[in-house]
Amino acid sequence: MDRRYFGTDGIRGRVGRTPMTPDFALRLGWAAGRVLAPRGNGLVIIGKDTRVSGYMFESALEAGLSAAGTDIRLLGPMPTPAVAYLTRTFRASAGIVISASHNPFYDNGFKFFSAQGTKLPDEVELAIEAELEKPIETVDSADIGKAERVVDAAGRYIEFCKSTIPNGTAFHDLKLVVDCAHGATYAVAPSVFEELGAEVVAIGAEPDGFNINEKAGSLHPENLRAAVLAQRADAGIALDGDGDRLVLVDEQGEVLDGDEALCIIALARAGEGALGGGVVGTQMSNLGLELALKAQGIAFERAAVGDRYVMEMLQQRGWLLGGESSGHILCLDRTSTGDGIVSALQVLAIMQATGRPLSELRKVMAKFPQTLLNVPLNGGVARDALLSAKAVKEAVRAAEGALGGEGRVLLRPSGTEPLMRVMVEGRERRQVEQIAREIAEAVRSVADHAG
């Protein structure tokens, strides 16, 4: 059965356009209540990021769930991984996050978590879509769901985050700059690090409903770099709007992406005998990560892009650690989903345990130069036809020949936007950039003619 609304990371779109409308949110809440409540205790947790539209969608979801006879706990602005955690601790049937992650304020979305704090299985998402096609029928008045606000949600999550590093680990000698992207972590992230003893300089922590991710957070580390250098900080931590991504900056102002953070954590876990198997990356993971892990005898597998697929492969293998270069890191020995704060804590704890600065820890991996270009596509272009077009296949074949087995070429359509992503990596940056431009031009030419 084809999906109509759910993508690789829930439902997402421009506010005011289907499906991101109040009436859709009302129907979604009702449909979700009908499907999810019978699978557990009839309770659903709702959290959101700091977008102004979140309040509108929260009310609509609440009404729909209540009409289906489902009780609700409202967390208010709270990171996505906090919703996953609190869904588990409340023994709820499901959790819903109102967020569009790293997108601008005018987008929003709905992410769902199972009772275990993981993404919903495909069959459950399809069941919700099937219910969406039915007219809303409100339960009897005596059975209408009740909504309550959870006033101590932030404190519960802060304590959980602190519990993910060894007892006795403290950051009293660390000065940190934390960029909250004017998003859902603005209140909790600085508190986590401060309570562990660090001196914290918070930036991107003044949300107004419209500035989420605006020149801030993990997609815009330039402000964090400048602040780390100006403050002479030991490290910088950049989170995205909903708090599930992490980008780091070392004390010299150099940016570390998710691959580098994942490598640091993996090698430290392996050294402790606590890795629990291999590591899962994605098709976009840097070749340097794979080589660094394999040099230490650590198995490495690539999943499709998206933390959902990393999670699926980890579960299939029975492994505990995986992630994406974008900064989604899954530490399943600590939590059930990607968590930027928890991932940052793991790296900082390694810094403290080894006495090595971040600029030294990052040397465990030598990154290959990598270029990623996004080619906009018009609505009439079939993705499969584009990938199989003769001109595109010839450009890829020529690129692979030029790289000579010391690099990779990857073309993949975006799961959330009308884009074709062109990724090229190899040993020489100029060559990589030139090859990426040539392939992107071939894709653009075929797409334009198809439109």
UniProtKB/Swiss-Prot annotation:
Signal peptide feature range: none
UniProt keyword Acetylation present: no
Pfam families linked: PGM_PMM_I (PF02878), PGM_PMM_II (PF02879), PGM_PMM_III (PF02880), PGM_PMM_IV (PF00408)
BP-aspect Gene Ontology terms: carbohydrate metabolic process; peptidoglycan biosynthetic process; UDP-N-acetylglucosamine biosynthetic process
Origin superkingdom: Bacteria
Residues bound to Mg(2+): S101, D240, D242, D244
Cofactor: Mg(2+)
Post-translational modification: Activated by phosphorylation.
GO MF: magnesium ion binding; phosphoglucosamine mutase activity; phosphomannomutase activity
InterPro entries hit by this protein: A-D-PHexomutase_a/b/a-I, A-D-PHexomutase_a/b/a-I/II/III, A-D-PHexomutase_a/b/a-II, A-D-PHexomutase_a/b/a-III, A-D-PHexomutase_C, A-D-PHexomutase_C_sf, A-D-PHexomutase_CS, Alpha-D-phosphohexomutase_SF
GO cellular component, one term: cytosol
Keyword tags: Isomerase, Magnesium, Metal-binding, Phosphoprotein
Modified-residue entries (Phosphoserine), positions: S101
Positions annotated as active site in the UniProt record: S101 (phosphoserine intermediate)
Catalytic activities: alpha-D-glucosamine 1-phosphate = D-glucosamine 6-phosphate
Cofactor descriptive note: Binds 1 Mg(2+) ion per subunit.
EC number of the protein: 5.4.2.10
Similarity comment text for this entry: Belongs to the phosphohexose mutase family.
Biological role: Catalyzes the conversion of glucosamine-6-phosphate to glucosamine-1-phosphate.
Protein name per the record: Phosphoglucosamine mutase
Top-level taxonomy: Bacteria, Pseudomonadati, Pseudomonadota, Gammaproteobacteria, Chromatiales
